């Protein structure tokens, strides 16, 4: 009367079979039912435990091989660091001819002394070259990315030259070299010399003016006394 409402066997292992689970209503509640009690058509005639076979032996061998390879690499690196072994250089995949062509493409003009690089989307027929500033050159040497796209106005042909000249002037102003320092010193010396000359000329002019100016009239004391006596006599 007070029996369990659930079906199935709750006894030992000898009373349980997966064949009974296939027809059970609660089949999906059994753990591992998809492998031990398969029902679908795609599961018939297939090895459902293929991923777990031949794994124990291969795992040990691969682990040992991996450790041996790591030890060998560490030993080679140590020997190369101590100088007992030459470091193997990896091939770049470029032949001498290809290297010469790349150098010709990326070479700068000898007149302007500016390095040039190929822009993105350029081909061998129409090569788009962009002038690099000194800061961009230093960044390229360090391996940093360089922005090579610049705005171009096709309607005015002379604008590109004007922009390039402005950039060169701004670079020269920002990064003055030893020649510019010398020029500025010379200009300062010239200005000082001119100021000193002007001061000397002004001093000379003042001295000449003071020497040429008429002396003030000085009345003698005798003449003044005589005039006073005459006035007294007339009175």
Swiss-Prot record:
Record keywords, A-Z: Isopeptide bond, Phosphoprotein, Ubl conjugation
Keyword Phosphoprotein (UniProt): yes
Biased amino acid composition, Basic and acidic residues: 106-115, 169-181
Biased composition (Basic residues): 182-201
Superkingdom: Eukaryota
Segments of skewed composition (Gly residues): 1-11
Modification Phosphoserine occurs at: 122, 126
Positions of crosslink type Glycyl lysine isopeptide (Lys-Gly) (interchain with G-Cter in SUMO2): 22, 104, 112
Pfam families for the chain: MMtag
Biased composition (Low complexity): 116-129
Region of interest called Disordered, as start-end residue ranges on this chain: 1-21, 106-129, 147-235
InterPro entries tied to this protein: MMTA2_N, MMTAG2-like
Protein name: Multiple myeloma tumor-associated protein 2 homolog
Protein species of origin: Bos taurus
Lineage: Eukaryota, Metazoa, Chordata, Craniata, Vertebrata
Name of the gene encoding the protein in the UniProt record: MMTAG2
